[in-house]
């Protein structure tokens, strides 16, 4: 390397930052653009304001290196694909670049979107780039250079952030005989080398490459590949200083390999997996070690005393130790400031995004100026830790005793074949029964009624009356369409986790704790802070009302224990398995009550089963064991004649196929539309013998599938699953779609089922 732009290190930073806006401004702007209510210039203005405000806030808080290029209209993997020219041919017909971008993200009537799956073990979803033999990489640096220019004009100490080449290719999908995308690595490295020079020419002093794939077992060659890549990038003649960020786990052998390259800084996650043994890596001498010591994924306040002790063991192991969050704060809400309903004790235990930035700055100051410089902050932290440990709300002896008793007596149901016979005699369903996953469109009338209730413009009785009308409308629509098994549509539910959290002991639901799940989809994860209990039934009134309107079976709809954990901010003071069992006990009681009320089918959704799977294979069996046990605890209290359904969505199912079978649900519905039914062969390989409903169309896209298209998917599914075990359903709930889209799609789905059923 001939010339480095700068060698001056930084001391306090974050790995990345959210982009939806503190009041979900980006969600409203993008959805307005999609609906043609907002112009492109208006959308870009909102985006620019959000970026500038975020950079300004981070710099003002005391960070001396601020990440840029973390903003995205939809997803950072899609942004990277655009930057690298890795676009499928099917969008070439779209002339406008932004419309091309959203076509790949969401699809339209002519273009299928990219497949979507979970970002490692988080609840964020990314779009999977497609790499085929015809893919020709070409650099399109307009976005990253434009945002760097904006930030530098604002005098922000800017550090562009880019998904690294190893992670980008390992997370991409080879299509049309293209082989594994990682085989194109050498070709892609040349593009990144060119980008480094451009960033240096445009004023970047540091650049961050995100390589979270290095904490996984995605490829045994990853450590060697990463070392080769960053040796090449570090040798670029004129470039910014390079910081490679690993997060979500322990980089293992990749750490020493990276340290042997010419790069200047390496980030390690000390919250999820890594420990202070990295201090024993001699190759770190001369590097900046960016210590991810403040949890970027959960909302608990950092124990500053403990964090400083960990940091102390790192001093001397590297030329410089900088303090950072463990990962991007994309995964936590913006700030505690809007949460006016928090009691003082609970508030003192928490740190959202803004508070985590403050913790980073405090810890960096302690390293620079000594502990006495932050004595007040350490005292406040110690008081919060003591308050949380002693709070009586954290423990419920009765709940723990009941779990022990039920587990001791067994959580297995009867033989699956005998259950099927009993359920068939009760339900009298046709072959290829049609159903939906649960939720129906959240119409403007539903949202207005919920807002009116929150603002005290209507009372609870009026709200219930309006929601019952929505239930009646959903039942009527399903009967008109000819569906075989109905749902009540969930109009009363704001979210499939928050709805239950608001009724369970041990949870707190935030007012404004929004985080991005994918695109414009935002969720408000509740805070699970203590032992979980169910004070009263949660769904009986709604499901029994819906069942009273029809002779067809209506499914009871519940969220499973693993998903409730995955989509909440969960206590970190006891094993996840213990907390899962507490949630499972509450769900078990609800299933028993539903059965007693005459409900014949109960669905316990576990869309997040894959999400919590540890990234290293050595740790996965233990997780899958307790996850399956929790589901069985939740579902084994009902009779054999009661049919248990479950639903799993956007995941790489291969790694959890055995666990899906072990759940022993009578009917399992899964996402399969974007992945072209590939999961069915995996299920057959593990001897899956229960009924299955592979999603026959993608609800995350506005396009309406044709009858022939759905029939083709069903015929493909029948090659793997016999007709007597195959169900017909969309791949997920319909909450985010319009009534017109839903009606047209379901009409075609029912027609396709009848066509295939008749042998046409």
Swiss-Prot record:
It is an enzyme of class 2 (transferase). It catalyses: 5-methyltetrahydropteroyltri-L-glutamate + L-homocysteine = tetrahydropteroyltri-L-glutamate + L-methionine. GO terms for molecular function: 5-methyltetrahydropteroyltriglutamate-homocysteine S-methyltransferase activity; zinc ion binding. The active site is at residue 700. Zn(2+) binds at residues 647, 649, 671, 732. L-methionine binds at residues 437-439, 490, 605. The keyword Metal-binding applies. GO terms for biological process: methionine biosynthetic process; methylation. NCBIfam families: met_syn_B12ind (TIGR01371), PRK05222.1 (NF003556). PANTHER family: 5-METHYLTETRAHYDROPTEROYLTRIGLUTAMATE--HOMOCYSTEINE METHYLTRANSFERASE (PTHR30519). It comes from Mycobacterium leprae (strain TN). Belongs to the vitamin-B12 independent methionine synthase family. Pfam families: Meth_synt_1, Meth_synt_2. Keywords: Amino-acid biosynthesis, Metal-binding, Methionine biosynthesis, Methyltransferase, Repeat, Transferase, Zinc. The keyword Phosphoprotein does not apply. This is 5-methyltetrahydropteroyltriglutamate--homocysteine methyltransferase. 5-methyltetrahydropteroyltri-L-glutamate binds at residues 24-27, 118, 521-522, 567, 611. Its cofactor is Zn(2+). It comes from the Bacteria. InterPro entries: Cbl-indep_Met_Synth_N (IPR013215), Cobalamin-indep_Met_synthase (IPR006276), Met_Synth_C/arc (IPR002629), UROD/MetE-like_sf (IPR038071). Binds 1 zinc ion per subunit.
